[in-house]
Amino acid sequence: EIVLTQSPAITAASLGQKVTITCSASSSVSYMHWYQQKSGTSPKPWIYEISKLASGVPARFSGSGSGTSYSLTISSMEAEDAAIYYCQQWNYPLITFGAGTKLELKR
């Protein structure tokens, strides 16, 4: 089983601040996907196949990485970006998720 470790577990950013969330895999994976979850809702696909934005995701989000190291970046934090973000990989037949990164708005 491939273990995904996210960093940081919790972070806070001010409006306009750049935010980077990292996801480290215990062994190499071909693709990494990211989900956004807001309170009381199910996780939504956010970034797929490393860097492709899901429909409706703002262009301030981007994804990058390869091998065992991947990241999600927000170029300029907005209030609506406060959420929990999960990385996810599929190494047939097992799907594994990171424990999540809680992103809060720093006021």
From Swiss-Prot:
Which UniProt keywords are given for this protein, alphabetically ordered?
Adaptive immunity, Disulfide bond, Immunity, Immunoglobulin
What InterPro entries does the annotation carry?
Ig-like_dom, Ig-like_dom_sf, Ig-like_fold, Ig_sub, Ig_V-set, IgV_Light_Chain
Q: Which PROSITE patterns match?
A: IG_LIKE (PS50835)
> According to the UniProt record, where is the region Framework-2?
34-48
Q: Where is this region: Framework-4?
A: 97-106
Enumerate the residue ranges of region (Complementarity-determining-2). 49-55
Q: Give the source's domain of life in one word.
A: Eukaryota
Q: Where is this region: Complementarity-determining-1?
A: 24-33
Q: Anything else of interest in the record?
A: The two sequences are identical.
Official protein name in the record: Ig kappa chain V-VI region TEPC 601/TEPC 191
Q: Identify the species of origin.
A: Mus musculus
